[in-house]
From Swiss-Prot:
Pfam family, one: RRM_1
Gene Ontology molecular-function annotations: RNA binding
GO biological process terms on file: cell differentiation; nervous system development
Biased composition (Gly residues): 1-14
Name of the molecule in the record: RNA-binding protein 45
Region (Disordered): 1-20, 192-212
Organism for this UniProt entry: Mus musculus
Length: 476
């Protein structure tokens, strides 16, 4: 168990979960030296804005700092600017190790990963249908450098749907836009485009969208990951569900009418949403809509997680596949299996037996790891013996979730001299140990910034190798 020491506004008082994440993305996560004090953190981070709380995670028994801290700002833009300017900096003249700074995930979201920069730069806005992309750019350029603007249009008529996206170059600029733009735009962070098969537990569904829908938090919408495992296992066993025609397009039926904006807000929970459409039928009191995703995996996930979802409360929506002329049965079975593995990998496994289940349990152990990527990988090579001296360690960041251990070992052993791969429990990071520096450098060159099985890897050099016992106690 961990404990935390804080330096809040009332002598160590730590706010509740609700105030910790209000407003969203206003809290940063720091990896620092174990000797860094709360006072130093306040001195270095106060120039970025109003600090509401600072606390350092400590060992429950020894009260020693674990090298992890949190800083809570009053505004999201302040936290983002602190992240942008302080990540990779040294806190003091005597410090030789640069700190790591991330936007911390909402504690009530059910997710256990940190938010990546690219998730914080694109905002979703509701605009007048008469707006052009130039009008949209003109309205939002005052908040920062815009990478692009886009307006969602009806694919048949080309008419604007009154929805748009604005992507900024920096997270702080997007946060400034959300905080300061006219309330009529209902600006909020959009789901990142590069997410392929994320889970609701991993997505940061903003509170603003929940308020617009009048719905309960997503943690209640998707309460138990075991249900998804069961559903996908059933799907993979050739029962009636497995025989259902699968496509990227979904039909949504409800006894209560809904608007395109409401439908979009519900199905944008699952990454990869392409468009929503609600046909007008003056002779029917029912709601009917069509939803299409960019990939089949997202459509499958949306179908099996949102079918039967109550919106509004008491009214269950019916979600089914619409035939789009594709036949992808075998591909879907593989995707479904991989998605189950990804879900299990992203959970917090607090015991050794649970970690062993992740690595060895279930059907995954009986199959060779499946690697889908456009990266040219070398052939598999034998691992080095566990007792081999460590010559180089790599630090790996996963977005949106860690890959399974067997897949990671299959990937990193291809460069030769691999000793061990391990994941940090509850985080989307891990370490790779090599017995040869050349092998480690080849892994960095080949894998850094690449996407494997829908997961983007950041691969970089970690600290110099130390004794295993000291290393494990150093930060976590």
């Amino acid at each position: 168990m961990d404990d935390a020491g804080g330096l809040g506004g009332s002598g160590g008082f730590r706010p509740g979960v609700d105030s910790l994440d209000e407003p969203p993305n206003s809290r940063i996560f720091l990896v620092i030296s174990k000797h860094t004090s709360e006072l130093v953190l306040r001195e270095r981070f106060s120039p970025f804005g109003d600090i509401q709380d600072i606390w350092v995670v400590r060992d429950k028994h020894t009260k020693e700092s674990k090298g992890v801290a949190f800083v809570k700002f009053a505004r999201s833009s302040q936290a983002c600017r602190a992240m942008e300017e302080m990540h990779g900096q040294c806190l003091g003249p005597s410090d030789t190790k640069p700190i790591k700074v991330f936007i911390a995930q909402s504690r009530s979201s059910g997710s256990h990963r940190d938010v990546e920069d690219e998730e914080l730069t694109r905002i979703f806005v509701m605009i007048p249908k008469s707006y052009t992309e130039e009008d949209l750019r003109e309205k939002f350029k005052v908040y920062g450098d815009i990478e692009y603007c886009s307006i969602i249009k009806n694919k048949v008529t080309g008419e604007s749907k009154g929805l748009g996206y604005v992507r900024y170059l920096k997270p702080s600029q997007a946060a400034q836009a959300i905080e300061n733009c006219d309330r009529s735009f209902r600006a909020l962070l959009a789901e990142p485009k590069n997410k392929v098969s994320g889970s609701p537990e991993q997505d940061d569904y903003s509170s603003g969208r929940q308020e617009a829908l009048g719905q309960e938090p997503r943690a209640n919408l998707f309460p138990f990951v075991g249900e998804q495992q069961s559903e996908f296992s059933t799907f993979d066993k050739n029962d009636s569900r497995g025989q259902e025609a699968v496509s990227k397009r979904l039909s949504v039926v409800s006894r209560v009418p809904f608007t395109e904006e409401q439908l979009f807000s519900i199905f944008d929970i699952v990454p990869g949403l392409e468009y929503c459409e609600v046909p007008r039928d003056p002779y029917s009191n029912y709601g009917h809509g069509v939803v299409q995703y960019f990939n089949v995996a997202s459509a499958i996930y949306a179908k099996y997680k949102l079918h039967g979802f109550q919106y509004p409360p008491g009214n269950r929506i019916v979600v089914s596949f619409l035939d789009d002329g594709s036949n992808m049965t075998e591909l879907i079975r593989k995707m479904a299996t991989q998605m189950v593995a990804a879900q299990l990998a992203s959970m917090v496994w607090s015991t050794t037996s649970q970690q062993q289940f992740l690595q060895y349990g279930g059907n995954a152990a009986s199959q060779a790891p499946q690697i889908q990527t456009d990266v040219v990988l070398p052939s598999c090579k034998k691992k080095a013996p566990p007792e081999t001296p460590v010559k180089e360690r790599l630090f790996v960041v996963f977005n949106p979730h860690p890959l399974p251990l067997d897949v990671l070992e299959d990937i990193f052993c291809r460069f030769g001299n691999l000793i061990e791969v391990y994941l940090v429990s509850g985080k989307n990071v891990g370490y790779v140990k090599y017995a040869d520096r050349k092998s480690a450098n080849e892994a960095i060159t080949t894998l850094h910034g690449k996407i494997l099985n829908g997961v983007r890897l950041k691969v970089m050099l970690a600290d110099s190798p130390r004794e295993e016992s000291k290393k494990r106690q150093r930060t976590y």
